[in-house]
Amino acid sequence: TSSSQMETDISGSFRSGIDLKGRITSQPIGAWKQVQGSGIARGAHVLIGNKSCVIAVGDSGYSPAPAAVASISTEIYDGQTWYAHANLPLSFRCGEGAGDVHSELLFGGEMSGSHVPYIAGIKNGTLRGDGTSFSQDAYMNTAQADGPAVKGGNVGTQNSALSVQLSYPSPGLVTTEEYDGMTWKLHPKQPMVAAGNESTGTVTAAIVVGGHGKGACTEFFDGTSWASGPTPPRQKCGGAMGGTQNDAMTIGGASNSPFYRESELFDGTSWTSTNQS
C-alpha cells in the first residue's frame, strides 16, 4: 500500500465516524476513596506493596489492640479485603521497610522516650520475610534508639536498600546506611540533616524531601554522594512519598495542618501542589 493510499484510508475512516455504545461518563482525576479498614488500627507501622497487594507490619504501641499482639502482627490487603498474615519473631515498633509483599525487608525501630520498652535486637536489626515467615538478619551500624532507620526515609528492595536519617537529629546518629542483602554499610551524611523525612527511588537514584525543621529541602542521592534540589512549596516534614527520583508524589505531614491534605508532585525539575486529598 502506498503512503498516499494509506493516508486516504485513514482519513476516510475518521470521516465515517466512530461507533460508540453506552453512556459517556467521566471520573474525577486524583480523587481518594475509602476502602475496607484493616483488622488492627496501627500507628507508626511499615507499609509495603501497592494498592492491589500491600502488607502492613508492626505498630508503635498506639493501637487499641494489646501491644504484644499489634507489634508482632502483619496483615495483607489484596485489593478488596484485609486478612491476617504471619507474625514477626520480635516486636516491631517505629521501624522502616523496603521490598515487596512476600519479599519484605524490615529494619530498625524504637524512638527514644517511647512509652514502650526497647526490644533488643530490633532497634538496629533486620527482619526478612519470604511470604511464609519472618527471620532476623544483619544488624545496622548505628545501634541506638533514634538511629537512622527510625521513622526516616527508606528505599529499595529486599537485597538492595537504603535507610536515610532518623526521627530526630543528633550528631552521632546522622547517617545513611545501605543494605546489600547481607550487610549494612555507612554512606556520607545527608547535607541538610533532615530527620523524619520522606524518600523514594532506588539505592543509586534516591530523592529525600523535608524533615523536622528542614521541610524546605530536596536532596538527591546517586549511590555515592548527595546533591541539593528545588524547594518544595509546602515545606513538609513527617509525610510519605512514592515514585522515582524524577517522578515523585508526596502527601501528609507531622501535624493536622490543613495544607498537609495536599499532595505534591515532582517531575525531576520542579514541584507543584494539587490540593487533592
For each feature predicted by the language model, list its residue ranges:
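Polar, enzyme-active/binding microenvironments
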Residues: T1-S277
